[in-house]
């Protein structure tokens, strides 16, 4: 389901709303012109960071020889929950129908996430906002793109932090 974040005057938003409802389910008026793009960039920066965090957590559990399915269930119901954990996990075998169960065929590609993280980094610099985790996520996704993974789903980033611990080929 497409989430739409729109910026502009309240009047312009109300005028566009019937068309936006055709395209998406969750529609938000983010504020003035440009605010929709800014909201999307902030949301996707958080998503990129949390996908890496979910990957790191599950990788650590794997290295500690703890059953990944048990850790996943615990995290879904505890303070470690996030969208990547509850809806879109980076490891196969946790939730049916996710890209991790389909050889990381993209829903949202590594290349698109990398683009959004670059935009977030540029925006942060332009307003002198400190986003060290966003900058680190950009470095990680950028390197993954340079290694030829830009067309994989962004959840395949688990391969970077998981290394050989996953033992799941993505090609």
Task: Set out the residue ranges of the language-model regions.
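Short beta-strand and adjoining strand-loop segment in the mid-core
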Residues: 1-21, 27-29, 42-50, 58-64, ...
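Short coil/turn segments
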Residues: 9, 32, 80
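ATP-dependent carboxylate/acyl-activation modules
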Residues: 21, 170-171
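A short secondary-structure junction motif
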Residues: 23-27, 82-85
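General beta-strand structural signal in soluble alpha/beta enzymes
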Residues: 28-31, 133
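Helical "substrate-binding/catalytic lid" subdomain
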Residues: 35-164, 168
């Amino acid at each position: 389901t497409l989430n739409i974040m729109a910026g502009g005057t309240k009047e312009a938003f109300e005028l566009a709303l019937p068309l936006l409802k055709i395209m998406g389910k969750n529609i938000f008026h983010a504020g003035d012109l440009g605010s929709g793009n800014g909201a999307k960039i902030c949301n996707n920066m958080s998503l990129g960071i949390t996908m890496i965090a979910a990957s790191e957590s599950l990788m650590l559990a794997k290295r500690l020889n703890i059953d990944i399915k048990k850790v996943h269930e615990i995290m879904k119901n505890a303070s470690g929950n996030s969208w990547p954990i509850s809806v879109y996990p980076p490891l196969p075998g946790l939730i049916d129908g996710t890209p991790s169960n389909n050889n990381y065929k993209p829903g949202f590609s590594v290349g698109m996430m990398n683009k959004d993280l670059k935009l977030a980094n540029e925006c942060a610099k332009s307003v002198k906002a400190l986003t060290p985790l966003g900058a680190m996520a950009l470095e990680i996704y950028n390197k993954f793109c340079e290694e030829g993974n830009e067309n994989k789903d962004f959840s395949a980033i688990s391969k970077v932090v998981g290394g050989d611990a996953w033992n799941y080929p993505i090609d």
